[in-house]
């Protein structure tokens, strides 16, 4: 009887299956990355502000941990790891829990509900309307910027980076609608209501000259009573490969401004400023522990303000005490590299 040759001897054994250690290792690495992303998004305070201030850096760009989720999911699909794909649900849930409500309220990640002049203020609407803008010392059209801001109809308008050469243009453009104004150094305030008690606020970090004046306080005599208005421009921060998140001068200035606010005797306080920091940055705790950020209370979207061409952070702030934010939004771009921000505040 003729047999069938199978090509295999009796002693031969099936070839062992190839180990999947590498695939599993890659899958586990993605799981770890997903868990870390979720933890850092939910608890940025876990990262200390050691050399380079990594904690503040994470808090500054915290919303931008969101794009890590689709990247992790794509890598999980490429690795064909079901466990890694499922793990991406954790950072997705954390991110949506933190930032989803702001997006669902309306507005996108960048515009924060760019409004027009519906909140025009003269006290008759039952709310105080304020506008804050770093007008830029390189603004090619100061007068046009001033007119655009006035169209929003704020009761008070705060400006930073006011250079002596551009100041007359701002004064002329705003004179008709804002009979009261005060300027200290490179910051100023224009108001529909009388101002009194204007003076500088010393927020100068150590090592800077006496000509560095970027803080002021005045009292606006509004229909709701006196309101202490602070205008400030904190020092810039830098991100470098060697120094990391260089924010020491900004942090020192924020602490000084916080002490000034803590000593304020009036019940109603408004801070308008380019703080070069987001409200969630731990370095601004001297301010956020005493004042309520208007955008967090009544804004839509992320309300990003800088840089104006493609905003990635909200460093221009309205913060209050003794007043209730009812709306907060960004205004259309001007000749500045910052977007203006506005808020309506109920007494």
How should these model regions be labeled?
Residues 126, 136-150, 158-347:
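Soluble catalytic domains of enzymes that build or remodel membrane lipids, polysaccharides, and related
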Residues 2-171:
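N-terminal, active-site-proximal structural segment of metallo-dependent hydrolase catalytic domains
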Residues 1-3, 14-19, 240-251:
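A charged, solvent-exposed segment within the mature domains of Sec-exported extracytoplasmic proteins
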């Amino acid at each position: 009887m003729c047999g069938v040759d199978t090509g295999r001897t009796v002693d031969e054994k099936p070839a062992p299956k190839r180990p999947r250690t590498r695939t599993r290792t890659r899958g586990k690495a993605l799981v770890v990355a997903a868990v870390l992303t979720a933890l850092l998004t939910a608890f940025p305070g876990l990262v200390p502000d050691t050399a380079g201030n990594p904690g503040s850096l994470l808090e500054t760009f915290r919303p931008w941990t969101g794009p890590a989720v689709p990247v992790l999911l794509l890598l999980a699909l490429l690795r064909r790891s079901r466990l890694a794909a499922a793990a991406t649900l954790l950072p997705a849930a954390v991110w949506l829990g933190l930032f989803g409500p702001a997006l669902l309220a309306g507005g996108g990640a960048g515009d924060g509900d760019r409004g027009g002049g519906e909140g025009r203020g003269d006290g008759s609407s039952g709310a105080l309307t304020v506008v804050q803008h770093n007008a830029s010392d390189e603004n090619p059209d100061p007068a046009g910027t001033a007119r655009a801001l006035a169209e929003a109809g704020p009761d008070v308008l705060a400006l930073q980076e006011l250079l002596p050469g551009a100041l007359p243009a701002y004064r002329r453009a705003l004179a008709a609608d804002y009979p009261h104004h005060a300027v200290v150094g490179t910051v100023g305030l224009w108001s529909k209501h009388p101002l009194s008690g204007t003076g500088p606020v010393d927020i100068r970090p150590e090592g800077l000259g006496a000509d560095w004046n970027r803080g002021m306080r005045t009292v606006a005599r509004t229909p709701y009573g006196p309101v202490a208005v602070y205008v400030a421009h904190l020092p810039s921060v830098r991100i470098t490969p060697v120094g990391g998140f260089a924010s020491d001068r900004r942090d020192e200035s924020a602490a000084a401004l916080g002490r000034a606010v803590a000593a304020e005797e009036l019940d109603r306080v408004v801070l308008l400023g380019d703080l070069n920091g987001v409200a969630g940055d731990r370095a601004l705790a001297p301010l956020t522990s005493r004042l309520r950020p208007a955008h967090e209370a009544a804004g839509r979207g992320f309300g990003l303000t800088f840089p104006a061409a493609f905003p990635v952070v909200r460093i221009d702030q309205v913060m209050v005490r003794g007043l209730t934010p009812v709306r907060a939004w960004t205004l259309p771009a001007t000749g500045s590299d910052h977007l203006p921000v506005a808020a309506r505040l109920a007494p």
